[in-house]
Amino acid sequence: MKLKQRVVLLAILLVIFIFTKVFLIDNLDTSAANREDQRAFHRMMTGLRVELAPKLDHTLQSPWEIAAQWVVPREVYPEETPELGAVMHAMATKKIIKADVGYKGTQLKALLILEGGQKVVFKPKRYSRDHVVEGEPYAGYDRHNAEVAAFHLDRILGFHRAPLVVGRFVNLRTEIKPVATEQLLSTFLTVGNNTCFYGKCYYCRETEPACADGDIMEGSVTLWLPDVWPLQKHRHPWGRTYREGKLARWEYDESYCDAVKKTSPYDSGPRLLDIIDTAVFDYLIGNADRHHYESFQDDEGASMLILLDNAKSFGNPSLDERSILAPLYQCCIIRVSTWNRLNYLKNGVLKSALKSAMAHDPISPVLSDPHLDAVDQRLLSVLATVKQCTDQFGMDTVLVEDRMPLSHL
């Protein structure tokens, strides 16, 4: 063989060798990441059922101090939380020492302070479990049970970006009225034999109060985030106009994601991928009302998108509002870890996991079976949407590796 031919052959072999090494290394990295995702999934499934128990083992701290220490820029609570049941038990049972009207917003809520000084948001029951909310996908009152279910879905998806939520029964006559501010107390009334209140908010009306069953009111309690983590509000780039006949740009411009990618904080960092995660989360729960979102202040785009205010969910199990997935199908990217978790949850696993996670909540059953079935069905639509993206652009473009370290943040 001539020298020139040998050189060419050696060059070809060298290129093949390099590509083989790169391919194998990439495959090993991906396999290692997949194995870690699988281990995380098994850890989640093992600790899924949270039994509300008062005892805190091996600590002199209050449940409120423990929950406050969990918060970091990319998580509200960690993956493994042996004290979770004790914290949620405290949320569901601790004495209410003050009750006031809710913070800003359009929907009825009350701001409670529990023994030990912990703030929580109380959202009252407005509908029975089998009630179907008709109309626009964002129609109706807030659903307290949706807050509970959304928190547990956040756990199951491995996001850890939703504040803790638990169901609670309160006696309006003996637990709320004696410690209520004058502003809240002035909104109480009696309808038949039931104690009711209508609070203070944009849509709150005396003609539309929330009523207890006698004096006992069912609701949800959301743990207030620590004051050392002030929030910053952002307009959601895929928010709706809420005006009849007026479309938002994303509703008619299929290249809208390209414009979003050129604006801060979506041009770098994790925020755009958080938007995609949130679109998946909101689609599964049927929440078409995320017009704004919160992150921690002064985060320069590094903070997570916090999954607050999920009560406009689980309204109609027969309605799958595909437009909620617009960030996903317009950007055609998703985290590898999210994609892996979604695949682990198919074939009925998601429904079973969600039902199991909520089994010990004080207001269980939290969701009706049609809503649980709907979550499973919507998961298939999410997977199909990602498949369409990978068919069009390829796996390497669509699936993004973005595992951010948490402990040092």
From Swiss-Prot:
Q: Which UniProt keywords apply?
A: ATP-binding, Disulfide bond, Glycoprotein, Golgi apparatus, Kinase, Manganese, Membrane, Metal-binding, Nucleotide-binding, Signal-anchor, Transferase, Transmembrane, Transmembrane helix
Give the EC number(s) under which this enzyme is classified.
2.7.1.-
Q: Which residues bind ATP?
A: Q107, K123, T222, L223, W224, L225, E294, D309
Question: InterPro entries from the xrefs?
Answer: FAM20, FAM20_C
One Pfam annotation reads Fam20C
Q: Name one GO molecular function term.
A: ATP binding
Q: Which residues lie on this side of the membrane: Cytoplasmic?
A: 1-6
**What membrane topology does the annotation report for this chain?**
Single-pass type II membrane protein
Q: Indicate which residues are glycosylated according to the record.
A: N193
Which stretches are Lumenal in the membrane topology?
26-409
A single Gene Ontology CC annotation of this entry is:
Golgi apparatus
Provide the protein's localization. Golgi apparatus membrane
Q: Where does Mn(2+) bind?
A: D142, D309
- Disulfide pairs here are C196-C211, C201-C204, C257-C331, C332-C389
Top EC class, one word = transferase
Q: Give tissue specificity per the record.
A: Widely expressed. Strongly expressed in pancreas, spleen and fetal liver.
Catalytic site positions: D289
Q: Where are the transmembrane segments?
A: 7-25
Top-level taxon of the source organism: Eukaryota
> Which cofactors does this protein require?
Mn(2+)
One Gene Ontology term of the biological-process aspect is: proteoglycan biosynthetic process
Function statement: Responsible for the 2-O-phosphorylation of xylose in the glycosaminoglycan-protein linkage region of proteoglycans thereby regulating the amount of mature GAG chains. Sulfated glycosaminoglycans (GAGs), including heparan sulfate and chondroitin sulfate, are synthesized on the so-called common GAG-protein linkage region (GlcUAbeta1-3Galbeta1-3Galbeta1-4Xylbeta1-O-Ser) of core proteins, which is formed by the stepwise addition of monosaccharide residues by the respective specific glycosyltransferases.
Report the family membership.
Answer: Belongs to the FAM20 family.
Q: What is the name listed in the Swiss-Prot or TrEMBL entry for this protein?
A: Glycosaminoglycan xylosylkinase
**Species in which this protein is naturally found:** Homo sapiens (Human)
